[in-house]
């Protein structure tokens, strides 16, 4: 027993050699003796022991016929400074456990975290089949199949087909911490050298190791983040087949490093390698993510293809930020007012008034004979979501002088106004109508603006239905043509089954009260059951016809006169008194009258503000000044 403890203590304090160990064993010391759960061999083999003697280890093992071989902690041994590869070979030949996991990693991964691992040791261990990643996981890919119906593909024009989605394991998408990863992330520690030989061997052993990702990033990403960078190491870890998204993440991380680490200098060789022949989509997304003009300019300066084409692609397919445009201009790109605005609108979601204003103010004009180059197509802005309504309205106001056709229709015959009605955008509908949108356009499917309003107001919940009713009043108060009215009446009559709610009668009354202003006899003939309601409406119509200014009644002022002529009436006390009335049925007309008064006042205020002494405008007759501003703002 005494010799057992002496042997253990000598091993524990590393104060032993082969001769003394042999003497103690011959004197009866048992190498299998345990103290606090440790045998002499386990106490001796530890990373704290900087001088593990092979002959001592072999003696402790061979004296008991290697029964204690797994007391040799191979994890601890691989962390020591004096690893003997021949001893490792002997231990492996005698059956030491080499496939175990300790603290979540295997022995190869553990060895990779040491200060100066040896290629030969890696080769010995990896040739024994120890995995280069002890906890590998795989991504997934989506398998999409179109659903067949009745033996044919189920397909509508411009409609999404039905698809079946299945998720399958993607064995090419490997995720986990590899030996290479452990080696790289530990190189930033003091005294931990980075060996190109080690990296080349590990990659040659398993080429796919470069493609493994941890937290969605490759080992190269962590190398550029953690270590002092050398080109030869970068080249060994770099692969041009990395995804464009990952390459831009690597570049972003590399460029940002100058703000995290003092004296870090950007190596243009690395920037060029990461940018070379890359999909411009990823480059532009990187520019957006950086939000730092210094970094963006660094990328653009190294971009070797056309910066002008890059700007065009940017405004066409990406969320646009003004600072990125400015950086491109600084690098030689030319911003064109209408060309780039039209491209900007083509990407769904590009609805930033500040960007539009910047391009309009700073963009160059294309000087040629094609007037279309100096016009803006606003159709791609629609349909829009209600949450972007104010942004789109601001954009329309900015683009108003340059809009090519406010009544442009799509291939279904739907106008911009029609799309805004469907999305119950009250402010957009009102602005479009005030600025010349045609309320009488009929779609290929026979819908009018009135029709869609009535149908949707009847179908939606009360809160949304109220918006459609308000839009309906706005449209009808502008008085549609009799052709539009007849098309609406015919459609609603042919599709009565659509109206199953209790709202349809009130909706029809809204239509009828304006229809009679266009064609009284036709309306009465189509809706004989509403004669009593029509009679009540006529009383308010008669009131509007009785109130006159120099022989011109209020309905004539509102519906028969052009904008400049209306300006002569709206400030008349008779008109302003009438605009204060409250009608039961025709308050929308009163609302429109008050809008005219408000617009007229704005014009008067602007005329007064700009008509200062000695400018050209002030020398014009007042009536001419009113005429100019009336055309511009009424």
UniProtKB/Swiss-Prot annotation:
GO molecular function, one term: RNA binding
GO biological process: symbiont-mediated suppression of host innate immune response
Keyword Repeat included in the entry's annotation: yes
Induction cue: Expressed in the early phase of the viral replicative cycle.
SUPFAM superfamilies reported in the protein's UniProt record: Ankyrin repeat
PROSITE patterns (alphabetical): ANK_REP_REGION (PS50297), ANK_REPEAT (PS50088)
Any Pfam family the entry gives: Ank_4
Start-end of each ANK repeat: 36-69, 70-100, 103-134, 175-211, 307-337, 412-441
Superkingdom classification of source: Viruses
Sorted UniProt keywords: ANK repeat, Early protein, Host-virus interaction, Inhibition of host innate immune response by virus, Repeat, Viral immunoevasion
Subunit structure: Interacts with components of host SCF complex CUL1 and SKP1 and components of the cullin deneddylation/COP9 signalosome complex subunits COPS7A and COPS7B.
Function: Plays a role in the inhibition of host immune repsonse by counteracting the action of interferons on early events in the viral replication cycle.
Family, as annotated: Belongs to the orthopoxvirus OPG025 family.
Protein name, entry field: Ankyrin repeat protein OPG025
């Amino acid at each position: 027993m005494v010799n057992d403890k002496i042997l253990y203590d000598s091993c524990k304090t590393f104060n032993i050699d082969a001769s003394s160990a042999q003497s103690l064993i011959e004197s009866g010391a048992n190498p299998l003796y345990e103290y606090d759960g440790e045998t002499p061999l386990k106490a001796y083999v530890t990373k704290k022991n900087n001088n593990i003697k092979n002959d001592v280890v072999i003696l402790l093992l061979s004296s008991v016929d290697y029964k204690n071989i797994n007391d040799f902690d191979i994890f601890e041994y691989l962390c020591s400074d004096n690893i003997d590869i021949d001893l490792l070979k002997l231990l492996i030949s005698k059956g030491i456990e080499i496939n175990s996991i300790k603290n979540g990693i295997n022995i190869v991964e553990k060895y990779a975290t040491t200060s100066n691992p040896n290629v030969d040791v890696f080769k010995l261990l990896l040739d024994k089949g120890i995995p280069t990643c002890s906890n590998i996981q795989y991504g997934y890919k989506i398998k999409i199949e179109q659903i067949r119906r009745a033996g044919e593909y189920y397909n509508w024009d411009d409609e999404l087909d039905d698809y079946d989605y299945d998720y399958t394991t993607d064995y090419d998408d490997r995720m986990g911490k590899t030996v290479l990863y452990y080696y790289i992330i530990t190189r930033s520690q003091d005294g931990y050298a980075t060996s190109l030989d080690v990296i080349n061997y590990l990659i040659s052993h398993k080429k796919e190791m470069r493609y493994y990702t941890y937290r969605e990033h490759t080992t190269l990403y962590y190398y550029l983040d953690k270590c002092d960078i050398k080109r030869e190491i970068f080249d060994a870890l770099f692969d041009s087949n990395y995804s464009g998204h990952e390459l831009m993440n690597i570049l972003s991380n590399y460029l940002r490093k100058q703000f995290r680490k003092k004296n870090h200098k950007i190596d243009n060789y690395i920037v060029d390698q990461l940018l070379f022949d890359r999909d411009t989509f990823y480059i532009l997304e990187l520019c957006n993510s950086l939000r730092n003009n210094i970094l963006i300019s660094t990328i653009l300066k190294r971009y070797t293809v056309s910066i002008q084409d890059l700007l065009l692609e940017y405004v066409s397919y990406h969320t646009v930020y003004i600072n990125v445009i400015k950086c491109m201009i600084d690098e030689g790109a030319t911003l064109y007012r209408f060309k780039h605005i039209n491209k900007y609108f083509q990407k769904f979601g590009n609805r930033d008034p500040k960007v539009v204003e910047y391009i309009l103010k700073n963009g160059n004009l294309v000087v040629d004979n094609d007037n279309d180059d100096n016009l803006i197509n606003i159709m791609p802005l629609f349909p829009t979501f209600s949450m972007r309504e104010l942004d789109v309205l601001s954009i329309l106001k900015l683009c108003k002088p340059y809009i090519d056709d406010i009544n442009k229709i799509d291939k279904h015959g739907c106008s911009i106004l029609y799309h805004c009605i469907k999305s119950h955008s009250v402010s957009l509908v009102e602005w479009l109508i005030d600025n010349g949108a045609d309320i009488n356009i009929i779609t290929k499917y026979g819908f009018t603006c009135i029709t869609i309003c009535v149908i949707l107001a009847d179908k939606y919940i009360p809160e949304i239905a109220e918006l459609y009713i308000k839009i309906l009043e706005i449209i009808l108060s502008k008085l549609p043509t009799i052709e539009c009215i007849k098309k609406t009446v015919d459609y609603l009559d042919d599709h009565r089954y659509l109206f199953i709610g209790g709202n349809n009668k009130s909706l029809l009354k809204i239509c009828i009260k304006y229809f009679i202003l266009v064609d009284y006899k036709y309306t009465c003939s189509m809706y004989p059951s509403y004669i009593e309601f029509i009679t009540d409406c006529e009383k308010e119509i008669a009131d509007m016809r009785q109130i006159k200014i120099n022989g011109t009644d209020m309905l004539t002022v509102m519906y028969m006169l052009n904008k400049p002529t209306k300006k002569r009436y709206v400030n008349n006390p008779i008109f302003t008194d009438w605009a204060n009335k409250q009608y039961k049925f025709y308050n929308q007309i009163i609302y429109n009258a008050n809008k005219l008064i408000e617009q007229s006042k704005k014009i008067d205020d602007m005329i007064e503000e700009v008509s200062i002494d000695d400018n050209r405008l002030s020398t014009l007759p007042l009536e001419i000044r009113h005429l100019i501003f009336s055309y511009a703002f009424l």
